[in-house]
């Protein structure tokens, strides 16, 4: 009898964690969509600042081809110079995975493709990892990795 009770408690606890993770996944998916909507329109007034607001001022951004960026200001300047009005990012459907980080936030991983603005060419695909921190009710990315860049065949 005790064994069955312990098993039931384990199943219920696992179900509670899954429900919590479902809510967390929905939150991070919404943040991802909002952040990259601003990224995709960063050539429009106010959108680059909106995109920047999703990142901690001391963001560490690791890009397999571009190297490491150590601050939000430098990352945003590079985005403005090389991305805005030229490329848009699309999340690969079904690829987003979110895991909680106790007393901090979440880790999001997935795949994304990059398409030329004004055309249908989506030539690049890569993997990403975003470390999201929740502090004082505000979610921000503290670390970002974009890697495994390759042709999207």
What do the predicted segments below correspond to?
Residues 98-106, 132-138:
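A short, structured loop/turn motif at beta-sheet edges
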Residues 91-93, 109, 122-128, 142:
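Short, surface-exposed coil-to-beta transition loops
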Residues 109-116:
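Short beta-strand segments that buttress and anchor functional surface loops
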Residues 12-13:
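Repetitive helical segments and hydrophobic/amphipathic motifs
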Residues 5, 16-57, 153:
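Short, low-complexity N-terminal intrinsically disordered segments enriched in polar/charged residues
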């Amino acid at each position: 009898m005790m064994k069955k009770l312990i098993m039931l408690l384990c199943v219920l606890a696992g179900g509670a964690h899954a429900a919590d993770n479902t809510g967390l996944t929905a939150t991070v998916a919404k943040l991802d969509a909002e952040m990259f909507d601003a990224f995709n329109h960063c050539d429009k007034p106010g959108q680059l600042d909106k995109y920047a607001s999703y990142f901690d001022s001391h963001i560490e951004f690791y890009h397999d081809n571009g190297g490491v960026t150590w601050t939000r200001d430098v990352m945003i300047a590079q985005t403005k110079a090389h991305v805005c009005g030229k490329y848009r990012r699309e999340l690969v459907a079904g690829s987003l995975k979110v895991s909680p980080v106790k007393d901090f936030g979440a880790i999001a991983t997935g795949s994304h493709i990059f398409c030329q603005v004004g055309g249908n060419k989506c030539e690049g695909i890569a993997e990403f990892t975003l470390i999201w921190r929740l502090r004082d009710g505000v979610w921000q990315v503290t670390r970002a990795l974009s890697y495994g860049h390759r042709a999207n065949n």
